[in-house]
Amino acid sequence: IQRSTILAICSLLIFSALCLFGAGVAIASGNSGNQTHVLDYTFRESELEADENLDIDTVKKELEAAGLTSQFSKILQIKVGKPKEHEAVSFEEVIKELKKQKGSKNKEILLHKFKQSTTSHLIPVSEYNELRKAASLPPLELTSKEAYLYMGKDFLPDENLVNSVLKANPQIKVMGNDIKLIGDVQSLQIVTDREITISVALILPDETFMSYTDSKYSNYVSGILAPDLVKEKGLMKAISDTNEKLNQSPLSYESYIQNMGRQLFYIISASYITIYLAIIFLVVANTIIGVQFLM
């Protein structure tokens, strides 16, 4: 009886080790998805708790004062707002189209997400087009009754599945108005800071955006380093030199390298810890089994 109990415990340890090992590998591979690198910096003002009141002109003046104007090829801003009415967005037709798709785990995740997205963020198309231009992508075109669906990469488990739903051009409701979703889902990062995330948003014409948000929004100002500077020094050196000058200005910032370093630390920590535990469990189980054979 004692040996059978020990064998059962060892089996559980080995099973747990295999589960942990699989989880560790999944964490490492699942978080290594390709993110299109466009922005090098996102700026904030040191005196402010958030950057809602920071505008592009203020950033340009501070960069000029710090002698950094020539080091940036482009400074752009993106407004992000919410409908002035609470729970004003309905994805009912999107959910219906999604239910018609082949069943999968990702389908259930997306269904839950769209059901919860009744207060989705809104983004003006002109400013998102500036981001697309920086990424060497063609601009988006919209009429007053059309919108593009935006989903952050971290919240987009299956881009092909979402695009297959959008092919039907489903209509959504925003503050009681019918809006047709067109094109493919958009997912370019609007800031370098991964702590600022958007799950689901709508890209709207500028006039529609201002009307639905009642001109109340957050403003995110970002910068792109000059290509010649990056080519000459390399990205890490260019950002390091720029950081030294930025540290002497009133602007606080998040750089692409800082963000990547933080994300890499999280991924390595999570994956290594689970794999390490898996190895410990395997060693303990094998030791117990070995001792039993020696007795």
Give, region by region, the residue ranges found by the protein language model.
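Basic-flanked hydrophobic alpha-helices used for secretion and membrane insertion
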Residues: 28, 34-280
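Hydrophobic alpha-helical transmembrane segments of multi-pass inner-membrane transport and secretion
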Residues: 2-30, 261-295
